[in-house]
Amino acid sequence: ALTFSACSDDDDDDKSINVPEAVTQALKQKYPNATDVDWKQKSSYFVADCWLDGKDSDIWFDANGNWWMTESEIYWNDVPGAVQTAFNNSEYANWVQDDYYFLLYPLQPMQYVIEVKQGNQKYQVFYSEDGGLMNTVNVTGKDDTIYPPEE
């Protein structure tokens, strides 16, 4: 069995990235229970790669400490029934399911993402919580990072 232990914030930051104090404070304020925090920089964003409520999560902030997005990896059983039904009736139903995520935003509704593969093709299929198809992104041979929408 794997066990995960919480580490003090002092030891978790990637020393090669200079994370602004406003960003580290914003993380502590928004998600005080985040553990095993490792900071990454993606474009102009600072991303806290951490454990949150038992889920591997990426929490996106701008340099001023404004929260833009939380992406958490989940299991199929965590995907709402309406999304499962919509996916099972989609053109991707027979593709290999690779990963599942839910995305939280400050202003936009929550989204669920199902990442699928077939042969050398890879797609991300985005759904609303009620199972509405929102977007399909071809990430074949590309960086499959999901960036926050411009709000």
Residues of each region from the PLM?
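C-terminal motif of bacterial Sec signal peptides marking the signal peptidase cleavage site
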Residues: 2-6
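Bacterial signal peptide processing site
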Residues: 8-11
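First exposed extracellular module after export/assembly in secreted or surface-exposed proteins
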Residues: 15-151
